Regions:
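Bacterial N-terminal signal peptides that target proteins for export
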Residues: 1-8
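C-terminal motif of bacterial Sec signal peptides marking the signal peptidase cleavage site
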Residues: 18-19
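Short, conserved catalytic or interaction motifs in soluble domains
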Residues: 22
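Core hydrophobic alpha-helical transmembrane segments of single-pass membrane proteins
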Residues: 10-15
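Central antiparallel beta-sheet cores of small beta-barrel/beta-sandwich binding domains
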Residues: 25-130
């Protein structure tokens, strides 16, 4: 009986360890990024920078470009390198929504829309990983 209980405890412990090891690693955007964006229909590329903090799948941060400084909130997908970020300018006069995907740990590409009825593409590169 004692051997049976010890075996059951060992199997239970092995199950917990296996379950902990099998948790998928998700992508992380934490760091400082430089990005470029181009509005659809215009031949002008703008530059900006953003600092992102990610905890679990939640994204927060700030970005700064020719249109001002924006507070960022968003989320990373649990099962893929896709993310969504919403930005709201500090004075509340401009907002954007970015849907993107990490192409590797250091780069992303995506499309954005604004509350000013504009849209375009955005590309970024991580310059500092925190």
């Amino acid at each position: 009986m004692k051997t049976f209980i010890m075996t059951a405890v060992a199997l239970l412990a092995a199950g917990f360890i296996t379950a902990c090891v099998s948790v998928p690693k998700h992508h992380n955007m934490t760091g400082t990024w430089k990005y470029t964006f181009e509005e659809t229909g215009k031949n002008e590329i703008q530059n900006g920078s953003m600092t992102i903090a990610q905890e679990s799948y939640a994204i927060t941060g700030k970005c700064n470009d020719a249109f001002g400084e924006f507070n960022l909130t968003g989320s990373m997908s649990e099962n893929s390198p896709k993310f969504m970020i919403d930005g709201k300018r500090n004075d509340g006069k401009r907002e954007f929504h970015l849907s993107g995907s990490l192409s590797c740990d250091k780069e992303f590409e995506g499309t954005y829309t604004t509350d000013q009825n504009t849209s375009g593409t955005m590309k970024g590169k991580r310059v500092i990983a925190d």
